């Protein structure tokens, strides 16, 4: 009886997942069954029915069209586009030398993960101490200075080169490809509107070398956005295609 009703009832049954104890969901189906179409339909409904924000991690760049339709932001992550996300971006105008808000500490922890990906191996205790020292110096100097600026990876690289330890030079050498080399897409100021209500991160064109670092930077940016939205009482819908 129940299966017969499901076959004959071709109406779209829409529920508000935000009212559930756990509103997470999965979309399953064989290729060509309409999974992406269903997600796009739900995204449109969410976007038009309130002020919730939508973020999409798009491994095949197939959600660019709907983002552009709704005036959203498309961030095409690759070495040959001019879309940049600065991993060191922070509200430097809210910094204080004592790091009372923990902003520098959180960025230091993120940079440990980023440097580990660039080096390609686990960090030892000396490397961790050097990286943390350089991150703290970079942001504390900005906090104490009269003119505020958002640092980029080359600023961090320069501070590493100033350190007396040989390990600091080794870390800087591992970062060189991603700072001054051909994979330097993260050595730029952010030039895309990641605060848009509808943001799609396209990752189809990433190479194997850049993919792990890009995922780390992208997830850091997304996490910061979700936390900020939570403080404002705004819901965030995160879609991860081809999970």
Please report, for each region that a protein language model flagged, where it lies by residue.
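P-loop NTPase motor domains
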Residues: 1-4, 8-10, 61-73, 79-81, ...
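Glycine-rich phosphate-binding loop of nucleotide-binding enzymes
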Residues: 4-77
């Amino acid at each position: 009886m129940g299966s017969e009703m499901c076959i004959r009832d071709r109406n779209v049954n829409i529920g508000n997942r935000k009212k559930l104890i756990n509103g997470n969901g999965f979309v399953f189906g064989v290729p060509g069954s309409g999974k992406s179409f269903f997600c796009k339909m739900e995204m449109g409904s969410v976007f038009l029915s309130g002020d919730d924000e939508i973020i999409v991690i798009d491994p095949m760049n197939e959600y660019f069209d709907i983002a552009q339709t709704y005036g959203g932001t498309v961030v095409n992550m690759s070495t040959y586009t001019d879309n940049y996300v600065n991993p060191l971006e922070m509200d430097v105008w809210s910094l204080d030398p004592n790091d009372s808000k923990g902003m520098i500490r959180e960025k230091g922890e993120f940079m440990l993960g980023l440097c580990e990906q660039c080096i390609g191996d686990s960090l030892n205790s000396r490397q961790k101490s050097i990286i943390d020292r350089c991150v703290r110096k970079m942001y504390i100097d900005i906090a104490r200075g009269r003119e505020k600026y958002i640092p980029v990876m080359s600023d961090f690289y320069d501070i590493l080169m100033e350190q007396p330890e040989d390990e600091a030079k080794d870390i800087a050498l591992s970062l060189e490809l991603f700072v001054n080399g051909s994979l330097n897409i993260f050595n730029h100021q952010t030039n895309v509107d990641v605060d848009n209500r509808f943001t799609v991160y396209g990752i189809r064109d990433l190479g194997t070398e850049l993919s792990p670092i890009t995922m780390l930077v992208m997830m850091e940016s997304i996490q910061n956005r979700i936390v900020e939205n939570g403080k404002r009482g705004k819901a965030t819908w995160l879609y991860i295609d081809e999970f």
